[in-house]
Amino acid sequence: LSDRVKLAAKLDATRISITPMDKRGKLSKKLEKTVNIQIHFTVAKNVTAAVGEKTFYCRITQPNEELLVKPGAGTFPFEGKQIPYSIRREIEYNGEDTPVTMYWPVEESLQSGTYRVKLFADGNLIGQASFTL
C-alpha cells in the first residue's frame, strides 16, 4: 500500500515546451543566434503529493550525448546515485497545476542536432522532451 501511495504522490511534468531564444527574447531559428534555452512545463495537479517548496532539476543532453553543465554545478540523488544537473529551480507547490520556467544561458558553442531534456523532482523522472537546433 505504501508503494501505491508513493506512486500516486509522484509529480508529473506536462505541457513541456522548449524554446531556443535570441537576445531579444524571441524564438531563435539559427543556432549561432541562440543565447538562451527556455524550458517551460506545468507540474500537474496532484492532491496526494506533499505541498511546499519543491526543487526541480533539468538535465539537457547535447546531440553528442554530453550533458550541458556549468562549472561548479551540483548533483542530485536519482536511483541511488548522485547525478549532475544543468538547471535547478525551487518553487512553492500547492497541489494545483503549477507553471515552471527554467532558462539555460548559452555560453558554449552549440552543436546542430537533437537535444534531450529530462526533468526531475523528489528523486523521480517527471517528464522528458527533445528539441532540434
Question: What residue spans do the PLM features occupy?
Answer:
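Membrane-proximal structural modules of membrane-associated proteins and complexes
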Residues: 1-133
